[in-house]
């Protein structure tokens, strides 16, 4: 896995620039975003039809770039988070975390 460019930029006090991906599971998307200067992408599984297979494919295509990949999972559930991390995602964004227990479940799953 390539180093997390988002983490590096943040540590240097720079502001990473990125995109949220809601549609289009084509192999050209990572290259387009790289040429556009993106430092990171958030793949949204909460508000679209991306399933885990689509998302894993996108993550693998982004690994050919220096773009850090984060995924907004549909819910805080171990199977979603573990699969994203196992696929090579750099991190997850979890929706509707409303308690310390939910936040801890998220950390435990990662």
Language-model segments: which ranges?
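Expand to "…catalyze enediolate/carbanion chemistry for C-C bond making/breaking, isomerization
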Residues: 1-110
């Amino acid at each position: 896995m390539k180093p997390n460019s988002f983490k590096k930029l943040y540590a240097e006090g720079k502001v990473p620039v990125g995109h949220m991906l809601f549609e289009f599971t084509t192999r050209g998307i990572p290259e387009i975003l790289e040429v556009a200067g993106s430092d990171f992408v958030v793949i949204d599984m909460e508000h679209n039809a991306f399933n885990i297979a689509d998302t894993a494919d996108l993550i693998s295509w982004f690994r050919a770039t220096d773009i850090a990949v984060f995924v907004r999972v549909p819910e805080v559930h171990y199977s979603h988070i573990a699969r994203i991390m196992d696929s090579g995602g750099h991190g997850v964004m979890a929706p509707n975390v409303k308690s310390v227990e939910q936040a801890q479940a998220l950390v435990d799953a990662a």
